[in-house]
Swiss-Prot record:
The keyword Transmembrane helix does not apply. It is found in: Cytoplasm. This is Glycerol-3-phosphate dehydrogenase [NAD(P)+]. Pathway: Membrane lipid metabolism; glycerophospholipid metabolism. GO terms for molecular function: glycerol-3-phosphate dehydrogenase [NAD(P)+] activity; NAD binding. It comes from the Bacteria. It holds the Pfam family NAD_Gly3P_dh_N. Catalyzes the reduction of the glycolytic intermediate dihydroxyacetone phosphate (DHAP) to sn-glycerol 3-phosphate (G3P), the key precursor for phospholipid synthesis. GO terms for biological process: carbohydrate metabolic process; glycerol-3-phosphate biosynthetic process; glycerol-3-phosphate catabolic process; glycerophospholipid metabolic process; phospholipid biosynthetic process. It comes from Helicobacter hepaticus (strain ATCC 51449 / 3B1). It is an enzyme of class 1 (oxidoreductase). NCBIfam families: PRK00094.1-2 (NF000940), PRK00094.1-4 (NF000942), PRK00094.2-1 (NF000943). NADPH binds at W12, R31, R32, K96, A128, R242, V266, E268.
Length: 311
């Protein structure tokens, strides 16, 4: 049984801790006390004859064979600067997004501190609320070190099927960009535009994210698979998606600060829309949906903007 430490006590971090506890000894670290949130998960694990998830200190968490990163992209650089991670490390990053201001991808931030051969990235269609009920799903573990991808795959529970891919850029662009398209999907549904419009929006969104990714060397096949189309269709069609709910709120005319306060959680697509817009302008990449979502987030009338979204 391997020792796995999960950094991040949010919904996704807790879900991954639960999933990994089927085969491993799992500890979790969070800035807040999450013992009450771990209790129902540990009760389920007990019925499955699995070890409980334990919340530990940062120092205790460093005593592990594998590390899983599930913290917000906006906090990633700051966290890595003080994490004091061991030299020999195997880390699975489940963070999705693009850093605001710098426009850095998650891999750029990670690889400033950790060798790329030691990092893998988890992508694909997966709601935390379904993972904690052991519902089946399929994910992709991207890494320039495919042996590491497959090694992390062996840690996963029976209900998660994993595939290995060397296309790190494709995986992280898809994982970040789909959150922006999901906001657009929420707006489309919130304005009751119908399924014809929704299909058009998602198809164009897939093309847009693919174009953006290919500019940075990503492979088209990544966007047609689980990390791209799979995650996009899931996130853009369900109220289980925070970014989709942001879109619903914007469609009602709510201000972004009000929506985020109601959510009480991070919605990566809000920051990512701005980052993609800035990168698109700098690199001369056509990003019409991301650009329009960024304008709506910053106060443009949603009905007026919807014409441009569907153009």
């Amino acid at each position: 049984m391997s020792k796995v430490s999960v950094f991040g006590g949010g919904a996704w971090g807790r879900a991954l801790a639960f999933a990994l506890a089927e085969k491993n000894e799992v500890r979790i670290i969070s800035r807040r006390d999450i013992s009450s949130l771990l209790e129902p998960l540990n009760q389920k694990l007990k019925t499955l004859n699995c070890t409980s998830i334990i919340q530990v200190s940062h120092k205790e968490a460093l005593d592990a064979q594998y590390f899983v990163m599930a913290i917000a992209t906006s906090a990633l650089r700051e966290w890595l600067a003080v994490a004091d991670l061991p030299q020999k490390i195997k880390i699975l990053c489940a963070s999705k997004g693009i850093e605001s201001g710098s426009g850095a991808f998650v891999s750029d931030i990670m690889e400033e501190r950790i060798a790329h051969k030691s990092i893998a990235y988890l992508c694909g269609p997966s709601f935390a609320s379904e993972v904690v009920h052991s519902l089946p799903c399929a994910l992709v573990i991207h890494s320039r070190n495919l042996e590491l991808s497959r090694e992390f795959g062996t840690l996963m529970p029976h209900f998660i099927k994993t595939y290995a891919s060397p296309d790190v850029v494709g995986g992280e662009v898809a994982g970040a960009y789909k959150n922006v398209i999901a906001i657009a999907g929420g707006i489309c549904d919130g304005l009751a535009f119908g399924m014809n419009a929704k299909a058009s929006l998602l198809a164009r969104g897939l093309v847009e994210m693919s174009r953006f990714g290919e500019h940075f060397g990503a492979k088209m096949e990544t966007f047609l698979g689980l990390s791209g189309a799979g995650d996009l269709f899931l996130t853009s069609n369900s109220t289980m998606s925070r970014n989709y709910r942001v879109g619903l709120g914007l469609a009602k005319g709510k201000a972004i600060n009000e929506i985020l306060k109601e959510l009480g959680e991070v919605a990566e697509g809000v920051i990512t829309a701005k980052a993609i817009t800035e990168i698109g302008q700098r690199e001369n990449i056509y990003t019409p949906i991301a650009r329009e979502i960024n304008l709506i987030i910053n106060g443009k009338n949603v009905r007026e903007s919807s014409k441009a979204l569907m153009a």
